[in-house]
């Protein structure tokens, strides 16, 4: 894979990171303690997640901050090295780029704030999905694209 293609994939990562960063900045400065009802199924509400996905280990006492930050850092470094050194189907590279941008977005929060800033809430009637952010969306999209690329490969 040439440098132009590699650069394009890193631009995807940077775009994911910046979308996450500025959306969290908006959430921090505009939401505060209030909730914005977007539509029947979605709200914007500020939440600070000290754990991992679905607040896993959120009340573990603080050590989990560095565990999750270390894990995200290792994943980010592996993704960077993979994008730089290996040639993949373009869809697999896009999936890596999305995951990288999302991982760095949440890693930034953990290192700077000690928690991840979440603000998107989906719900249906009385069922509420855990609050999440655009980094989580990028990671999820990356995993879905990875599965599609893998199925396409076979």
Swiss-Prot record:
<feature type="transmembrane region" description="Helical">
    <location>
        <begin position="129"/>
        <end position="149"/>
    </location>
</feature>
<keyword id="KW-0812">Transmembrane</keyword>
<keyword id="KW-0064">Aspartyl protease</keyword>
<dbReference type="InterPro" id="IPR001872">
    <property type="entry name" value="Peptidase_A8"/>
</dbReference>
<comment type="pathway">
    <text>Protein modification; lipoprotein biosynthesis (signal peptide cleavage).</text>
</comment>
<keyword id="KW-0378">Hydrolase</keyword>
<feature type="transmembrane region" description="Helical">
    <location>
        <begin position="66"/>
        <end position="86"/>
    </location>
</feature>
<keyword id="KW-1003">Cell membrane</keyword>
<feature type="active site">
    <location>
        <position position="118"/>
    </location>
</feature>
<keyword id="KW-0645">Protease</keyword>
<keyword id="KW-0997">Cell inner membrane</keyword>
<dbReference type="Pfam" id="PF01252">
    <property type="entry name" value="Peptidase_A8"/>
</dbReference>
<dbReference type="GO" id="GO:0004190">
    <property type="term" value="F:aspartic-type endopeptidase activity"/>
</dbReference>
<dbReference type="GO" id="GO:0006508">
    <property type="term" value="P:proteolysis"/>
</dbReference>
<keyword id="KW-0472">Membrane</keyword>
<comment type="similarity">
    <text>Belongs to the peptidase A8 family.</text>
</comment>
<feature type="active site">
    <location>
        <position position="136"/>
    </location>
</feature>
<feature type="transmembrane region" description="Helical">
    <location>
        <begin position="88"/>
        <end position="108"/>
    </location>
</feature>
<dbReference type="GO" id="GO:0005886">
    <property type="term" value="C:plasma membrane"/>
</dbReference>
<feature type="transmembrane region" description="Helical">
    <location>
        <begin position="8"/>
        <end position="28"/>
    </location>
</feature>
<protein>
    <recommendedName>
        <fullName>Lipoprotein signal peptidase</fullName>
        <ecNumber>3.4.23.36</ecNumber>
    </recommendedName>
</protein>
<keyword id="KW-1133">Transmembrane helix</keyword>
<comment type="function">
    <text>This protein specifically catalyzes the removal of signal peptides from prolipoproteins.</text>
</comment>
<feature type="transmembrane region" description="Helical">
    <location>
        <begin position="36"/>
        <end position="56"/>
    </location>
</feature>
């Amino acid at each position: 894979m040439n440098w132009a293609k590699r650069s394009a994939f890193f631009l995807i990562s940077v775009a994911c990171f910046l979308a996450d960063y500025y959306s969290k900045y908006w959430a921090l400065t505009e939401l505060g303690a209030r909730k914005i009802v977007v539509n029947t199924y979605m709200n914007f509400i500020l939440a600070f997640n000290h754990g991992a996905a679905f607040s896993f280990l959120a009340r573990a006492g603080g050590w989990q901050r560095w565990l999750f930050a270390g894990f995200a850092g290792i994943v980010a470094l592996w993704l960077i090295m993979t994008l730089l050194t290996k040639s993949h189907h373009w869809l697999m590279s896009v999936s890596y780029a999305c995951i990288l941008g999302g991982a760095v977005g949440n890693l930034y929060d953990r290192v700077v704030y000690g928690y991840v800033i979440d603000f998107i809430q989906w719900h249906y009637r009385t069922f509420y999905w855990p609050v999440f952010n655009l980094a989580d969306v990028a990671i999820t999209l990356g995993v879905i694209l990875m599965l599609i690329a893998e199925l396409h490969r076979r």
